[in-house]
A protein has these predicted regions:
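Glycine- and small/polar-enriched repetitive beta-structure motifs of secreted/surface proteins
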Residues: 1-294
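Intramolecular chaperone/auto-protease modules of tailspike-like proteins
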Residues: 293-414
Length: 414
């Protein structure tokens, strides 16, 4: 039927439009192209076996476009509004609708799925059960996705390349989430973001290589910044914000780390700063303060503390200067071979500071059995750095003042 034109229909090639009964505005060019189109309108096919050239069932659908050898090869029935461009693009699609598949082998395993968009060689090439996905990039989303992966978005070379199950997954960037097989609600944006994770869920990674070493079933981590959280490989529930910011260890849990080059202190700790181990928080209001829950209804075994003046007398207030990061022992995590500000923060180098020495505080604590394990003035971080929390001293100061006040009253009464 070469060079035939009926009601705006053009068919060129061996058996092209071979079974057309009625229809309008279709253009078919190629060996066996559209050979089983019977009644559909507005179909366009260019290429060997394109648009149903390999099946015996009639094609009655409309508004399909198939360009390339075997593009839409098996399409049939009432399939409509599919755009298939590239060799073997959508070649197994039979009755699916509203799919856009562009690129060699793009969406080649889809059968009767709908509303998928795949652009790139091998994009969405291994899935036969998924709907409503957006896959853009060579080899992106090429795994055997199931219906549990409906709505997946992958943009970038090999992004989401291994996904089989994973509702609510979004991967944008070269290699983002490329190893994930199953896991819900992961979001990775950036070059190789979350690229090694396999089964975790509810993670958010934004930035080049963010959470790039998570390689198991990590859950509910948030990392924002280039290389943020890159040292995590088995941790959960961490929030890490800042370029090169990291948790204290690969299996950290519940850490909050904010700041460029900052490393977390310990699990359940919040660490803020700029590449120093000494953290500070500036508040704009002079009346602002930090509050912690202290409700009686949350406590039991309440007793009057006996730790007071005797402990205070063991402490030695000191003045000191902060070193620069390049001057501390190289074994410490704070060491940096560069001209960085003092460890106390920008503007503190050379200034006389006031405080305590952590090792001396620990020695004083060890001498007082009435200081219980919940006393948090002294801490040792996972990297061995010792730290002091001055705020924990307040109850002891109050007790010391009460003891002194009682002595004064006793003296005055004599």
């Amino acid at each position: 039927q070469a060079d035939i034109s009926v009601d705006g229909v053009i068919g060129i090639g061996h058996q092209a439009l071979n079974t057309l009964i009625s229809g309008s505005a279709s253009t078919v060019v190629g060996y066996l192209a559209g050979k089983n189109l019977t009644t559909g309108n507005n179909n366009t096919a260019f290429g060997y076996n394109s648009l149903g050239g390999n099946v015996t069932n009639a094609l009655t659908g409309a508004d399909n476009i198939a360009l390339g050898a075997n593009a839409g090869r098996d399409i049939q029935g009432s399939a409509e509004a599919n755009i298939l461009i590239g060799k073997d693009a959508g070649d197994s699609l039979t009755t699916g609708n509203f799919n856009i598949l562009i690129g060699r082998d793009a969406g080649e395993a889809l059968v009767d799925e709908t509303h998928n968009t795949a652009i790139g060689a091998d994009a969405l090439s291994g899935s036969s059960l998924v709907d409503q996905t957006v896959i853009i990039g060579s080899q992106a989303g090429k795994g055997a996705m199931t219906a549990d992966a409906n709505g997946t978005v992958c943009v970038g070379y090999e992004s989401g390349a291994a996904i089989t199950e994973g509702a609510g997954t979004t991967a944008i960037g070269f290699g983002a989430l490329k190893a994930l097989t199953e896991g819900d609600n992961n979001i990775a944006i950036g070059y190789n973001a979350l690229d090694e994770i396999t089964t975790g869920g509810a993670n958010i990674a934004i930035g080049t290589n963010a959470l790039g070493n998570c390689d198991g079933g990590e859950n509910e981590n948030i990392a924002i910044g280039n290389n943020a959280g890159a040292n995590l490989d088995n941790g959960n529930n961490n929030t890490i914000v800042g370029s090169n910011a990291n948790a204290s260890s690969g299996n950290a849990n519940g850490q909050i780390v904010i700041g460029k080059d900052v490393t977390g202190a310990n699990n359940a700790f919040a660490t803020l700063g700029l590449s120093t181990s000494i953290k500070s928080i500036d508040l704009t209001s002079s009346s602002a303060s930090w509050s912690g829950s202290s409700d009686e209804r949350l406590k039991e075994n309440i007793q009057t503390s006996t730790a007071g003046l005797s402990f205070i007398n063991e402490l030695r207030p000191v003045t000191f200067n902060w070193k620069k990061a390049k001057d501390v022992d190289k074994s410490m995590s704070q060491y940096q071979d560069s001209e960085e500000p003092a460890l106390g923060g920008e503007g503190t180098y050379g200034k006389i500071m006031h405080g305590f020495v952590a090792q001396e505080v620990k020695s004083a604590i060890d001498k007082h059995s009435d200081l219980k394990e919940g006393f948090g003035m002294w801490q040792e971080w996972e990297d061995g750095t010792q730290a002091v929390s001055d705020g924990a001293l307040v109850p002891m100061l109050v007790k010391a003042i009460q003891e002194l006040s009682a002595r004064v009253e006793e003296l005055e009464s004599k």
